[in-house]
Amino acid sequence: MSITPERKQALISEYGAKAGDTGSPEVQVAILSERISNLTEHFKSHNKDNHSRRGLLKLVSQRRSLLDYLKKKDEGRYKTLIGRLGLRR
């Protein structure tokens, strides 16, 4: 369910502005999207796992908040990010 440190570093290098950039909204949204997709796969075989489903809803809400913040601050970066991640908006 969690992502490996190697995968997290790959996401940071792909979406970050520089090597150690873990705080930018783009990196945070990319990491949350990876965790959300992992949990979605988990629910295909464990559909009664309601405890983890609550965690998934929290992750989706957190990602939504970060995307709203990014859209408010810089709409160009927002549109680029959702295009790169393949999010519907």
Curated annotation (Swiss-Prot):
It holds the Pfam family Ribosomal_S15. One of its GO terms (cellular component) is cytosolic small ribosomal subunit. Coiled coil: none annotated. GO terms for molecular function: rRNA binding; structural constituent of ribosome. GO terms for biological process: translation. The keyword Ribonucleoprotein applies. The keyword rRNA-binding applies. Gene3D superfamilies: 6.10.250.3130, S15/NS1, RNA-binding (1.10.287.10). InterPro entries: Ribosomal_uS15, Ribosomal_uS15_bac-type, uS15_NS1_RNA-bd_sf. Keywords: Ribonucleoprotein, Ribosomal protein, RNA-binding, rRNA-binding. NCBIfam families: S15_bact (TIGR00952). One of the primary rRNA binding proteins, it binds directly to 16S rRNA where it helps nucleate assembly of the platform of the 30S subunit by binding and bridging several RNA helices of the 16S rRNA. Part of the 30S ribosomal subunit. Forms a bridge to the 50S subunit in the 70S ribosome, contacting the 23S rRNA. Belongs to the universal ribosomal protein uS15 family. This is Small ribosomal subunit protein uS15. It comes from Azorhizobium caulinodans (strain ATCC 43989 / DSM 5975 / JCM 20966 / LMG 6465 / NBRC 14845 / NCIMB 13405 / ORS 571). The lineage of its organism: Bacteria, Pseudomonadati, Pseudomonadota, Alphaproteobacteria, Hyphomicrobiales. The gene is rpsO.
